[in-house]
Amino acid sequence: MAHARMILVAAMAVVPAVALAHGDEDSPLHVDPRVDECSIRFDAGLTQGAYQRFAREFGSVSAFKPTSAPVNLGRGRFAIAVEQLNFSIEDHADRWNDTFVHPDSEHDLGSDQMFPKLRARVGITDALDLGAFYTRNPNANYGWIGLDANYGLLQQAKGAPVSLGVRGAWTKTLFVHDMKMNTGTAQVGVGRTLWNVLTPYVYGGADVVVAQETSERVDLKTETEVVPHVMTGAELRWWHVSIVAEVHVSDLTSYQVQIGALF
């Protein structure tokens, strides 16, 4: 009997918590039949706390990532690539529900997100590469553009035991009326090439996300968030082909796969 009472008490304690945890899932979607796809538009009920979390997650996960080992291309060489970015979100949480509008009440944003990217990189010197990327959701109102610079401090090809580099990047969110978002990234990466073709690597660093609200429906202060991250991956370079797989661990975990051509 005592065990039964303990189980009952535990169940009574858990049920409200479960109900609270699922409360966000019952949040109604904000609907505008004029949009073709889920688009960024702030609802009047968006709070400062939810906006802060959105800035951290959206800004960091969309930031320009290396998706390459810290191995420089070399002067005069260049690379073009197509990349797939995958990550998951809590799409019914306030920070995502109150920042998006939907074509109808059944058209969820979805927890699993995927975006293709176009990238290019050029070797300015043997130790300095400059790169850029671009993507957008063609049926929605957001996309991103980014620039980066990679400087090699140590190069395994020149006798060092590993390749060591520093990287800086800038990412701008495009086409959104309700906010201006810019993200700066600073990283240090190290990798070691095996068998002259495969380079496992790791990066550590942080994103600085600056999100300025510009909506007519809310009055929120600008958020400046420092979001640390680590990432690991491996790059296979053979002939004129580069294949990369990378995992980025931060407020949101993301996965990148890239295939490119080297010239």
Predicted regions and their residues:
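Predominantly the C-terminal beta-signal and adjacent terminal strand-loop region
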Residues: 22-40, 220-231, 235-263
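Transmembrane beta-barrel domains of Gram-negative outer membranes and organellar outer membranes
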Residues: 22-158
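Residues on the lipid-exposed face of transmembrane beta-strands in outer-membrane beta-barrel proteins
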Residues: 68-69, 80, 118-124, 147-151, ...
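Residues that define the transmembrane beta-barrel architecture of outer-membrane proteins
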Residues: 74-76, 111-118, 140-145, 180-184, ...
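Transmembrane beta-strands of outer-membrane beta-barrel pores
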Residues: 84-88, 134-138, 153, 168-174, ...
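Outer-membrane beta-barrel translocator domains and adjoining extracellular loop/strand segments
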Residues: 92-97, 133, 142-147, 175-181, ...
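Repeated loop/turn-to-beta-strand initiation elements of outer-membrane beta-barrel proteins
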Residues: 126-130, 156-159, 197-200, 238-244
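Detector for outer-membrane/organellar transmembrane beta-barrel domains
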Residues: 159-214
